[in-house]
Amino acid sequence: MAITDIKKKPTLKSNGSAVVKKTTTTSIAAAPKKSTLTEKPKQIVKKVIKKQEEKEVKEEEEEEVKEEIKKEIKKEIKNEELDEDSLLEKEEEEKEIEEFINNTNQKKSEEEEKKYENVTFESLGVHPQIIDACNKLGFNKPKEIQRESIPWALKGRDIIGLAQTGSGKTAAFVIPVLQKLLEAPQGLFCLALAPTRELAYQIADQFNAIGSTIGVKTCVLVGGIDSMSQSLALAKKPHVVVGSPGRVLHHLEHTKGFNLRSIKYFIMDEADRLFSADFEEEVNNILKVIPKERNTYLFSATMTSKVAKLQRASLVNPVKVQVASKYQTVDTLLQQYLFVPFKYKDCYLAYILNELAGNLTIIFTSTCASSTKIAMMLRNLGFGAIPINGDMDQGKRLASLNKFKQGTKSILVATDVAARGLDIPSVDLVINYDVPTNSKEYVHRVGRTARAGNSGRAITIVTQYDVEMYQRIEFVLKKKLDSFPCQEETVLIFLERVQEAHRIATNELKDKNYSSSSDRHSGDSEGSIDINKRKVIKKVHKKKKY
């Protein structure tokens, strides 16, 4: 006959104190030997937490801490024979310890928030005139990247800034530059480089907005605009010059009287992109003609780890301000994927847009022709879509962007020209029609939504040919994405209409002298990968159109 014993087992609360639970166990004779593990979880946790505090473990190292705890537990139970009940107890204790660590880290983050609760632009040392401009723009409190970088910048240090997209990076370098300009005004005070035309205009807009109270003058130097009008603007000695490397170098070589020998500040926004082969020659030539006695700021959402590349920018004792891991997306972003058959890719795109109608959406494609064709196809289906890509002249690109910002068109079909730096806070949805070829581009693409604390959604369409690239992205992000729910039967209801819209778009493109053979439409990602591989083998670096 079985004997029922009432045993008391200590468990761990989130605050670290032990409570007693009553558990009922059944045995044939005497109770089995109780695992010594049950008496030690609290001591183990305390020991590891102490190590955590000593090492000042950061948020991204939480997993390492948890692994350390598990190793400690394994040491405790080594050479010990555990029965089924003891194994269950061990699992429960591991869960309790993990919960304890999570609660501890949560408390630490809450304490940090309280610590920075009273931090203001004034306490950071920002000039009252600039604070007034920030308040008018709704910048009432400094963001994390601004809190960390502005004090160092005002002390005259070079800065490498790494922060998530939409976290206020632009203002983090604009504010200190304007403050130093206010203290010692001069023409051609600052040069800011950006990899795309749209980002250059956005940086200039930020300088104009925050510098409105001090009368700052800016000049934008990008391709697609008449260089003569830019030369006339340079002749007026603007305080800040913002441009793409190619056009800045063009004016250095061809505009009489223009030089950068007097600049005090040199900024590279989206610095990792500017260090790539596409801009290497131009950036190196610009670095040769600017003074060594200057302050340099490098900012990006993803940053190269190659020290040699950073050294080319001639940084002097730089401060690294990092408020995000190398490849990190914001917590307010819902990231999903949709695995689809290659031949039904367009049909699934139409289904997603129909299901999530009413959202301001950016669709990313891998080629310019694909961007134009998909926009045409979606318009034929009744969606308000407009393209933006490197094949369009600057006037048309800005017109597309303005229509999208104003809400006249709700869908922007873009190449990676729109992936970096564009700040449109109201974007609700990002769709990766073509899987990005690397994790950096994924981070920048999905960073167009969920900006400045807002929520957003990103959906990546994955075909059978994209699985390896997609898995690589998940591996680097250290995150498994959820699947976007849908039924194929429901999706295929759109098939006939989508095929007809695609046929009409193809004919329209032929009329505009687009070569369909160079596009392959849905196969863009495959084709572009093969082309890129051949380019690497031949070591021929053709510049992308930005």
UniProtKB/Swiss-Prot annotation:
GO biological-process terms attached to the record: rRNA processing
CDD domains in the record: DEADc_DDX47, SF2_C_DEAD
Biased composition, class Basic residues, residue ranges: 534-546
MF (Gene Ontology): ATP binding; ATP hydrolysis activity; RNA binding; RNA helicase activity
Boundaries of every Helicase C-terminal domain copy: 348-492
Residues annotated as binding ATP: A163, Q164, T165, G166, S167, G168, K169, T170
Organism: Dictyostelium discoideum
GO cellular component, one term: nucleus
Region (Disordered): 1-21, 85-112, 512-546
Positions of short motif DEAD box: 269-272
Biased composition (Basic and acidic residues): 512-524
Name of the protein in its database record: Probable ATP-dependent RNA helicase ddx47
Described function: Probable ATP-dependent RNA helicase which may be involved in ribosome biogenesis.
UniProt KW NADP keyword: no
Domain Helicase ATP-binding: 150-321
Keyword Transit peptide listed: no
InterPro entries: DDX47/Rrp3_DEADc, DEAD/DEAH_box_helicase_dom, DEAD_box_RNA_helicase, Helicase_ATP-bd, Helicase_C-like, P-loop_NTPase, RNA-helicase_DEAD-box_CS, RNA_helicase_DEAD_Q_motif
Biased composition (Polar residues): 12-21
EC class name: hydrolase
Biased composition (Acidic residues): 85-99
Pfam families associated with the record: DEAD, Helicase_C
Entry domain remark: The Q motif is unique to and characteristic of the DEAD box family of RNA helicases and controls ATP binding and hydrolysis.
Family membership noted in the UniProt record: Belongs to the DEAD box helicase family. DDX47/RRP3 subfamily.
Gene: ddx47
Keywords carried by this UniProt record: ATP-binding, Helicase, Hydrolase, Nucleotide-binding, Nucleus, Ribosome biogenesis, RNA-binding, rRNA processing
